[in-house]
C-alpha cells in the first residue's frame, strides 16, 4: 500500500513489508482499511498538508483537526475505522485526539515497535493506538485494565488539571534542541537532495533543526536528564498525573502552524522527552510512570 509519510519526497513509495505492529494486528484478525493523511513527515500539529490537503475536523469544522496524526482521528469520528494507529513525537496522537474528540495513547517508550515508521526524532518517537474509547485503545495493545477509578488512586494535578492534588511538574522547553538535532540528523542528507519537494513550513523547521549546534544539543541532553529527575520527584507519592492536553484553545482550521506549535505541544512534549505513557481523553491528559500504561488507561476511563 502506498505510504507517503505525507511527503512529496515519498509520493510513490510502496513498502515491501508491513510494519511489525501492523503485521501483528493483522495476524490477530484486524483488517487494514486504508492509510490516512497527516502533517507532512509527521512534523506539525495541524495536519495542514500542502501536498495532500488539509485534514478536516469532522466534529468542529471551523477548528484544526490537530496533528500530526490528524487523519487517524478524523477517520474515527467519521466511522471509517474502528481503531487507528498514529505516531507521537511531541504530541501527535494526543493533540488530534483532543481536537477531534477521540481517545489516543502515547505508550511507554518502546512498548510499541516503531520499526517501519519513518523517523522524526528517534529517541522521542512513539507509535500508539487511537480509538473512540479507552477500551478500544487497550484492545489494540492487548492490555487488561485494572478495575480502578480515580477515587482508588493517588492523583496529582499539573498545569490546571481538572482533578487531583497540585504538583509542581516540569515542562520541557529546554529539551527541544535535542529533539531538533535528532530531526536534523534524519534529514541532513535527504533535505539537500530534495529541498524543493518539502512544504514551505517544513523547510523552515528542517533548516532550523539542521543548524542546531553540538553545544546546544549537549545542553539540551543535560536538560533532559534533569527533567527525568525533577519529574520523578514531582510524581513521588502519586499513581498518575492529570493535566490538560492543550495549553490553549483549539486553533482555527486556517491557523499558521508555526505560530501555534509551541502552545499546542507545551503539555504533551514533556512525556515524549520522558518516555512516560500519556493518554488523551476528552481533552484531559492522564500520564504515569514507564510501564504503567494499563493503569493510565484505567484512570482515563473516569473521564469518558
Residue ranges and their predicted role:
Residues 9-13, 125-132, 206-212:
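Short, well-ordered beta-strand elements within core beta-sheets of diverse protein domains
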Residues 23, 27, 77-159, 218, ...:
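Structural helix-boundary/capping segments
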Residues 18, 26-27, 212, 216-304:
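Glycine-rich, small-residue loops and helix-cap segments
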Residues 50-53, 100-104, 178-183, 260-261:
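Short, hinge-like loop/turn segments at secondary-structure boundaries
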